Amino acid sequence: MKYRSVFDIIGPVMIGPSSSHTAGAARIGRVARSLFGREPERIIVSFYGSFAETYKGHGTDVAIIGGLLDFDTFDERIKTAIQIAEAKGIDIEFRVEDAVPVHPNTAKITISDEKGELELTGISIGGGKIEITELNGFELRLSGNHPAILVVHNDKFGTIAGVANVLAKFSINVGHMEVARKDIGQLALMTIEVDQNIDDHILDELSKLPNIIQVTKIAD
């Protein structure tokens, strides 16, 4: 899911008329799928701003569903993603919201099954680039351009240092890191973008640290 050099300007190869409305939308959906870790049974997509005005004509709805099915931006199946999802028995609902977003190309995705639910807000900033701005009520800034680790934890002294020590042990270089929390001493979310894909055994070691609740990753 990484794009470099000229692709950062003109956008990746994509199915659809606009890199912001299709490639970016597909990547938002794919990040949600990656974090959820499995195919959802129910999908609710809420469109804001420009997305709300043009999502049907520009294929934004199709692109997001394609991403949620784990299709890449150049996958021809994106064109029929909604039909494919419905054939799988996935329940899909699109909503147009009146609220004025900070960025015009904004979508909120809620996906769920009998095991759980995930809510994610993403923006498409042009050229196929995206930012994830909210995850399950936590504010964050996640580009989707690099492998990332997301750590849900209790806001306790030494937790961040413990995670950093594990990453240093395996020579994992951190490109960007931030922490959001509900309140002092409550649930927190650590977002860590790194320079290489993370093996599962590293995630296992992170998950065994004190105060860690859940560890997930986004692969490159």
UniProtKB/Swiss-Prot annotation:
CDD domains: ACT_LSD (cd04903). GO terms for molecular function: 4 iron, 4 sulfur cluster binding; L-serine ammonia-lyase activity; metal ion binding. Its EC number is 4.3.1.17. Pfam families: ACT, SDH_beta. Belongs to the iron-sulfur dependent L-serine dehydratase family. Heterodimer of an alpha chain and a beta chain. This is Probable L-serine dehydratase, beta chain. It comes from Bacillus subtilis (strain 168).
